[in-house]
Amino acid sequence: MYQRALLFSALLSVSRAQQAGTAQEEVHPSLTWQRCEASGSCTEVAGSVVLDSNWRWTHSVDGYTNCYTGNEWDATLCPDNESCAQNCAVDGADYEATYGITSNGDSLTLKFVTGSNVGSRVYLMEDDETYQMFDLLNNEFTFDVDVSNLPCGLNGALYFTSMDADGGLSKYEGNTAGAKYGTGYCDSQCPRDIKFINGLGNVEGWEPSDSDANAGVGGMGTCCPEMDIWEANSISTAYTPHPCDSVEQTMCEGDSCGGTYSDDRYGGTCDPDGCDFNSYRMGNTSFYGPGAIIDTSSKFTVVTQFIADGGSLSEIKRFYVQNGEVIPNSESNISGVEGNSITSEFCTAQKTAFGDEDIFAQHGGLSAMGDAASAMVLILSIWDDHHSSMMWLDSSYPTDADPSQPGVARGTCEQGAGDPDVVESEHADASVTFSNIKFGPIGSTF
C-alpha cells in the first residue's frame, strides 16, 4: 500500500507534527464540479482531489528508511508518538500507477486493487492547500455514479465529515503537510487506524491487524460528525447521518473512542451506527440492484437534499434520476415506520422497530447533525471491510440474527461473500466512478 521511492527527503524543523517529504512532487488530479444557483444556472468550478495521508509512503525526513512497513512502525524512528512526528514525513503520490486513481474532466475513477495497494480515499480541494468546504443546510448535493463494477463486500462511498479545512496545519506548529498531503481525517467511528493524529504519530499502543497486512489500531482515535451521502455497491446502498457531541474534530484515547475499533462500541462521543436508510433493509427488496427500479448495471444520478426548519436540519431527502426519469426514494415497508426520507420521527420509529439502541438520539440526532453541516469536507473512497465484511450494508447482519426479523436483512449477498481475502483476490479489478458533481440550493441541480 505504501509507495517506496528512492529520492532524497529534506530535513524539516518541527517540534511535533506530521511532515511533508520531497521525494516525489505532489500533483493533485484535477476534478471539475458545478456550483448552482436557485435560478438553475450552474457554474463550473476547477477543483482537484488529494489522497489521504494514511495511504502515503511514510519515511525518515533525512533519508529513505520506511517509518512504517506493512502494518508495523520502525522502532528506531518511532519509539513514541512525538519522536515519530519529528522523524517521519509523508510524501507525494503517483495517483494512477500506485493507487489506481484517475480523473477526466468531471469524472473520478477509483480502482480497488493496484499492485499491492488496496482501496483509496481522496478529498475534494478548493486549492492546493485547502479542502473545499460545504454548507449543506437548505442545499442539495447531486452526482452521477457507476457501481456496476462493485460486487458484494465492496463500498464505493461518497460522504462528508467535519475535518479542518487545512488538514490541521494551523493547529500544530511546524506541520508542513496539511491538506496538501491529505492530513486530518476524522469520522464518527473515531478511527484508531490513522497513523498521525493531531500532529502526533499514533505509535504508542499500536497493535498490527491480524487480518489486514497494511493496517493496525493505535492508542489514539480521531472523531467528528459524518454525513454518509452514499455507501454502496451494485447490490445495496444506504445514506446515514452520524452526529457527535462536538461539531469539530477531536482526539480520543483507547476504548473511550468507541466505534468499530474499540471494545466498547458506544463508549465514545460519536454515533457509530447513525440513522440509516437502506431500501432493502426498509423492506423494499426490488428497488435497488441489477435490473431493479434503480438499475445498478448502468450509471444513474443521486440527489440528496438537506431541508432545514428554522435553521435546524429537519429532513434529508433522496431522489434518483435514471434514463431521464426522476425516481423518489423508496417508501418504508416496515410496520410502524413510515416515510421515504430521514427525519427524527423516522429514526425513532426505525430504532424501535429494529430493536436497536437509539445512540443516534443520545448524540443529538438530526439537530446535532445539522449543527455540524455548515462546514464539511467531501470524501470519496473505495474500500473493503476487515471488521464485518460489509455485511452491515449488503447481507444479513448481525450474523447470528434471524434474517426474517425486521432490520436484519440488508441485501442479497451471502454471508462471507465480502470477506477481504475473497474480494481482494477475486475482484481486484473492481472500481467505482463518480462524476457530474453539482451543489446548490434545493431544486437547482437536477
Swiss-Prot record:
CDD domains: GH7_CBH_EG (cd07999). Residues 1-17 form the signal peptide. It is found in: Secreted. Glycans are attached at N81, N284, N333. SUPFAM superfamilies: Concanavalin A-like lectins/glucanases (SSF49899). GO terms for biological process: cellulose catabolic process; glucan catabolic process. GO terms for molecular function: cellulose 1,4-beta-cellobiosidase activity. InterPro entries: ConA-like_dom_sf, Glyco_hydro_7, Glyco_hydro_7_sf. Keywords: Carbohydrate metabolism, Cellulose degradation, Glycoprotein, Glycosidase, Hydrolase, Polysaccharide degradation, Secreted, Signal. This is Probable 1,4-beta-D-glucan cellobiohydrolase A. It comes from Emericella nidulans (strain FGSC A4 / ATCC 38163 / CBS 112.46 / NRRL 194 / M139).
